[in-house]
Amino acid sequence: MKSTLSYLLIICSLFTACIGHQEESLLFYVDTRTGTAPSATHTAELFGKNTEEYGQTLPAVLEPNGMNFWTPQTQDTEAKCKAPYYYKDTKIQGFRNSHWIVGGCTQDYGSMTLMPVSGTLKYLPQDRGSLFSHQEETATPAYYSVLLKDYSIFAEMTGRSRSAIFRFTYNQPEDAYLIVNPNSDEGKGYIEIDTIKKQIRGYNPVHRIYQGWGEPAGYNGYFIIEYQNEIEEYGTFRHDSLFAGQRQIADGTGIGAYLRFKIHSEGPILIKAASSFTDMEGAQKNLDTEIPHWDFDRTRQELNSIWEQRLSQVTVQTNNRNDKEKFYGALYRASFLPRTFNDVDGRYPSFSTGHPFRQSANGRNYYEDYSMWDTYRALHPLVNILTPKKAGDMMQSLVDKYEQGGWLPIFPCWNSYTAAMIGDHCISALGDAYIKGIRNFDINKACEGMLRNAFRTPATYEEYKNGMGRRALNSYLKYGYIPLEDSVPEAFHTCEQVSRTLEYAYDDFVLAQVLQKLETSDDYFPDPQKTGLYDTLMIRARYYRNVINPSTGYAQGRYADGSFLTDAGNAFSFTRFITEGAPCHYTSVSYTHLRAHETSAHL
């Protein structure tokens, strides 16, 4: 009874604090769980059964554009289209340093999960999951807490970009365990227990999807866990086999480690964690720099202040609380990606290969995970307005990828080429930033990469297959559109020829504006090869007209001989020549009207 009352007092005090300050703190307009439940929209019913009907968001604790998204876990996989947490799930399996591409349908990578349990040792995620109630969750950008009912453990989490601190209050201190496991679906990874340093260390190898599916990405997600308490028992496990007293284990399905703490009275214990994409030393330095102490409330206040500053960049002039919740919740979700990829000392793995390690210059961050087809229209322009310096660092990171990999990426994720989705929208993002006055990136090197993508195709098939270069560029240049005969086989989204044509036309327009701006700018580095390219690109910017069927007024598939597809009933039907939609409808991108650079054509 005493224990139950203590938890109720903790929860009530937190709730009272929220009520007392809800008009002072913008954080209380943000429920980080929004988007984790299935959508009830008509679009969701038509498209993406069992995957994209979810918002695919996370109730994460993070710094804006931080490395890790610290999230409760209800799904024990890094598989494609499986977010770590779904609102409808009934059991929490632990707390993860997720690198999920929020809002998308890709994969998590390089993550680990830790979980406090009590009583009988249960270590596999599907066995150790605890019932919980959404009424007993607190989910803000800077703090998450929940009562794990099966164990009577009150779990709290806060953190920084690369690190986190947890406070677990055990009701059964004589059987207080901590479970840690790398989340490798490929059965790879390593974990070790260091009882002298009071640490658990390990790594989870990163693997690619889309181009190079299943291949190693060339680097690992390293992690380090630190604890203060003495322990009475430790060991490792692999799937359903437990190895008491063993300090390390490598590879195999479902590996991990466990500790049993030596505590004999009620009260919280503290756990710290950090990660790195370079090495274990990087993870240690990240932890020592970001959370060099054991003060949970201090870290929480630091992250609170960071989010107050972020959210207060925009003032919503309304007394409608629902509108404020929608807006500030959206601003929170617009602060996930791209993510910081470097350690506090500036080191990060090379783009595309993982090695050698690179060093970001002048104290800037190197960013990764650009879901570019989804973000070039609105997210990156928003970053340009709210945080122009960060926007420039994000653009320089794209330039770095070009210099390290040889081609400007199409859809850079998990620090690799992917050729996922369509378009060539790093051009759009770079051009938009430069035209709008962002100057803290190398525009001449960026222009070199943009021109390479716009006019050249990789010399070898292996490079192209690996995701380098614009898809179907040769067809686009030959016909002025991508004909239906070109199925675009070396892409995750094959076909979609009309959508690609429309997207490329806009990219070419943006590149033309950059060239025109550079000719009258102090940034311009004279290059005879650029002469006349503006006119060429402006002609290509009108290629979108080549896939508008004059007899219907809609975008339509076109053959190499110039004839249009004759299916007159396809304007509102899903079709392979349009990306995730139909030529003209209200449930997806209305590609017929994707010509933002010629708005007069809509009239």
Which stretches of residues belong to each language-model region?
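Cytosolic catalytic cores of cyclic-nucleotide second-messenger enzymes
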Residues: 603
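Accessory carbohydrate-recognition regions in carbohydrate-active enzymes
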Residues: 21-380, 384-428, 434-502, 506-520, ...
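Bacterial Sec-dependent N-terminal signal peptides
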Residues: 1-23
